[in-house]
């Protein structure tokens, strides 16, 4: 049997979070090793599902796309990224344990773009590359795993092509932050499709995208499988996923923002365009 449903971005994030938390390798890393969950809107949902408790999701991020611009939340407004070791939350920054990571340990990182070839794009504003600069090369050198959570709303034609453009020193003008883009060709993307197939004995396809009236950025999916599994999946979607509210979003004052690569840096609220006030 086939079944069809549509998910808003918030609903997709909740589904991805539940799918990530159900992965045996994530459960193993949480119980027996290190599990690092980097900041991001989607990874915040993953963290809630992994911990089984509420997280201040709108502050569990650094870079964000908010009010129609690329933006960075002030460091003082951000929640600390969570590092788990053998089931316990460590009161440390993830970078302090980077050299301790070994086989079975996992980093969960959000993505900003995805293409049909499985390439993941990660936006970078920090001159040192942010999380990518701190973890990617070291993890790659040791053959360790980073799972990139990325919703299908972020599909673009080619991450490889997009990554040839941009860069904070190469962009002459911008509305919002200037940024570069890393193309991760060897990562493990985890989308709504992966979540559905991790949770149920079904196959899933991305059927359509878009919407309005609160469904902007929505994705429509079809699942197919045995009747009982499809029914179980649809009951889950209706009971656990549909109706997930959108995050309100938190934007710091442009006046005191430390990010230099933004045309709004240093501006008082009265000098900002209406969509940013």
Each PLM stretch: what is its role?
Residues 277:
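Long, contiguous binding/interaction regions
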């Amino acid at each position: 049997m086939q079944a069809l449903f549509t998910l808003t971005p918030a609903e997709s994030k909740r589904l991805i979070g539940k799918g990530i938390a159900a992965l045996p390798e994530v459960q193993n890393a949480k119980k027996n090793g290190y599990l690092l969950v980097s900041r991001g809107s989607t990874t915040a949902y993953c963290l809630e599902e992994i911990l089984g408790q509420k997280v201040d999701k709108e502050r569990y991020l650094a870079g964000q796309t908010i009010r129609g611009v690329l933006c960075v939340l002030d460091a003082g407004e951000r929640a600390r990224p969570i590092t788990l070791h053998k089931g316990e939350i460590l009161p440390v920054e993830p970078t302090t344990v980077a050299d301790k990571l070994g086989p079975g340990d996992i980093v969960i990182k959000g993505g900003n773009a995805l293409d049909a070839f499985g390439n993941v794009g990660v936006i970078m504003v920090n001159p040192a590359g942010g999380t990518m600069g701190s973890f990617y090369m070291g993890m790659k050198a040791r053959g360790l795993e980073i799972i990139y959570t990325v919703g299908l709303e972020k599909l673009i034609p080619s991450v490889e092509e997009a990554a040839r453009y941009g860069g904070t020193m190469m962009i002459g003008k911008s509305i919002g932050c200037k940024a570069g883009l890393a193309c991760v060709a060897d990562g493990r993307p985890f989308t709504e499709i992966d979540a559905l197939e991790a949770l149920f004995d079904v196959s899933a396809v991305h059927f359509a995208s878009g919407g309005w009236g609160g469904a902007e950025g929505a994705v429509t999916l079809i699942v197919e499988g045995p009747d009982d599994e499809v029914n179980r999946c649809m009951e889950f979607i209706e009971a656990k996923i549909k109706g997930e509210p959108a995050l309100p979003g938190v934007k710091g004052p442009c006046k005191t923002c430390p990010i230099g690569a933004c045309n709004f840096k240093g501006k008082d609220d009265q000098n900002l365009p209406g969509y940013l006030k």
